[in-house]
Amino acid sequence: MKTVTVRDLVVGEGAPKIIVSLMGKTITDVKSEALAYREADFDILEWRVDHFANVTTAESVLEAAGAIREIITDKPLLFTFRSAKEGGEQALTTEQYIALNRAAVDSGLVDMIDLELFTGDDEVKATVGYAHQHNVAVIMSNHDFHKTPAAEEIVQRLRKMQELGADIPKIAVMPQTKADVLTLLTATVEMQERYADRPIITMSMSKTGVISRLAGEVFGSAATFGAVKKASAPGQISVADLRTVLTILHQA
């Protein structure tokens, strides 16, 4: 299986990489959060642009991206607008969403973008190609905050992301039962062992699913999300605790 290298970080080998999310509403918030994150132990900084109030003004978005880049100089920057329908803070039209991601790619300030699988195949494929032309990696994602689909459906979605050119397919689902967590882990193993030719990221959310955030190296998930301050999704644990557990499992 091939790995994905972003800056000096190799995703898909060794312990799962830790991603943290920055969620400031204004440029001032974004700067202060980035400064607070500077000393934290993580691997990838995700900027959750859907939390940013001025998201429809390209100049403001790029100014904020530049501010983050000036403060966090050494870590890969992942640009993510999470749509309202997949748990995000705001809604954009498909045209606005694609234009925003293309502007991020054009800026040269971001290393990765997050594209939601269900944006539309043609739009997704074209935007993946555009990102790759500019040496920007693509995490393709799907989120279900209500349930855990069947393992076959989870695998099918991850395979579809791979077919559409994602560098890293990602899925996050909500467990209603403990068995749902096993469903997600089973799907992860099946995808990783039978179909994946690149790293994948999977997680079962909430307190019930927290084991999935810790045991990625065992089951086949190449990265996990931790919290520096406020969690960006239910079930996230602090980056310090996360690193400790990931290291223990890696060295076992």
UniProtKB/Swiss-Prot annotation:
EC number(s) given by UniProt: 4.2.1.10
Keywords tagged on the record: Amino-acid biosynthesis, Aromatic amino acid biosynthesis, Lyase, Schiff base
Active site (catalytic residues): 143, 170
GO biological process: 3,4-dihydroxybenzoate biosynthetic process; amino acid biosynthetic process; aromatic amino acid family biosynthetic process; chorismate biosynthetic process
Chemical reaction(s) catalysed: 3-dehydroquinate = 3-dehydroshikimate + H2O
One family name in Pfam for this protein: DHquinase_I
Molecular function (Gene Ontology), one example: 3-dehydroquinate dehydratase activity
Gene name linked to the record: aroD
Task performed by this protein: Involved in the third step of the chorismate pathway, which leads to the biosynthesis of aromatic amino acids. Catalyzes the cis-dehydration of 3-dehydroquinate (DHQ) and introduces the first double bond of the aromatic ring to yield 3-dehydroshikimate.
Subunit record text: Homodimer.
Family, per entry: Belongs to the type-I 3-dehydroquinase family.
InterPro entries xref list: 3-dehydroquinate_DH_AS, Aldolase_TIM, DHquinase_I, Type-I_3-dehydroquinase
Full protein name: 3-dehydroquinate dehydratase
Family matches, as HAMAP family: AroD (MF_00214)
Signal peptide: none
Listed PANTHER family: 3-DEHYDROQUINATE DEHYDRATASE
Metabolic or biological pathway: Metabolic intermediate biosynthesis; chorismate biosynthesis; chorismate from D-erythrose 4-phosphate and phosphoenolpyruvate: step 3/7
Class in the EC hierarchy, top level: lyase
List of residues binding 3-dehydroquinate: 21, 46-48, 82, 213, 232, 236
Source organism: Salmonella agona (strain SL483)
